[in-house]
Amino acid sequence: MYSTELGINLFGSESNKKIQLNRIKILQKKINNFKIFLVIAGTNTSQIKGISAAGINAKSRRITALADAEFLLKGASKDHKYKLPRLNAGVTPALISHVCSKLINVYPVIVPLGIGVRPYFNHLVVEDRDLGPSNCLTTGKSMTKERVLNLYEKGLAIGKSSKQPILISESVPGGTTTAQAVMEAFGLRVSNLVGSSLFKAPRELRRKVVQKGLLNANLKTDFDSFDVVASVGDPFQAFSMGLLIGARLANQPVILSGGSQMLAVILLVLEFLGEKNKDDFIEDVFIATTGWLVKDNSLNDLLNLINEKYDANLLGLASPLNFQSSIYKELMDYELGHVKEGVGAGGISILAFLNGFKNKEIVSLCQQNLEIMKGLGQISLEKDC
């Protein structure tokens, strides 16, 4: 469904769209008051060859999240410390998020979890950096439950103290695989629906990885959301569960900006809440992503699957951003199905559109930043040798 008035595409629940549209209009009045969180997290699941496009090899994927966060804050600049990883095609979606966050004059808050280093730029300290990435989900023991609960409680406290609407975004190499594992742990068969940053989703590889993780986890019938995250999840999921619930307890609207990773967080929260206060909770929760990610309809099907399982009416928002007019291959690659989403590109660009900015303006600024990146040698599409 396309909203002519708002200029954005809607997907997901077919019911109560009129009510949802009114809520989106309310968001328009709060755009410049939004608090954007970028949660960058590490999972050793990303080290599996062929699992992610967030860096061309395992070594580069270790710094992808840090480089994305740095670029989100600074844009194209000569004083970058973390080198953006080489990609087979496209360019980091942090480019889109940087441009659009600057347009709406919002400075993102970076939350590093399991990265292993303390970033030099401003960030929120949530846990000891020495904890490092979560284990590969194939172990069935991604994290201790103590760590999961600590991350959840920290997120909950931050969310409950929020005095403004929040947008949650992520950069988690390997995160779509942990998202799939979480959803399948709760009985959803989603291997053909979960997207990927890769041009062609590694569905068979992910299926085997998830299957091995769930087998080793050996979850019993009485497991809960925290058990699942501890078994096959990642730090982002634990923290974001708390952040989302806390913000809603503070009666703040929440935009979850991303794809399957955000739907995994929603599912974990719905499982945790049960029927109690479910309707009040989801009333002002929005899933936001790019138009490129919803092109093949898989994300729409995935959202509807969750709506059906939990008798919910979640609505998705798809950004109208496109690079069809771009003169650069790196941006045109998005139109061909490369990269698609990440670093909150969909949700943050939607905020820019709702604030009155046009596609032409966003594309122009993306191209300007890309030109600077090329001049500084910050972008490379060379293939790994």
Curated annotation (Swiss-Prot):
Family annotation (Pfam families): DBI_PRT (PF02277)
UniProt GO MF annotations: nicotinate-nucleotide-dimethylbenzimidazole phosphoribosyltransferase activity
Disulfide bond sites: none
Full protein name: UPF0284 protein PMT9312_0438
InterPro entries: Nict_dMeBzImd_PRibTrfase (IPR003200), Nict_dMeBzImd_PRibTrfase_arc (IPR002805), Nict_dMeBzImd_PRibTrfase_sf (IPR036087)
PANTHER family listed in its UniProt record: PTHR38811, UPF0284 PROTEIN SLL1500
Family the UniProt entry places it in: Belongs to the UPF0284 family.
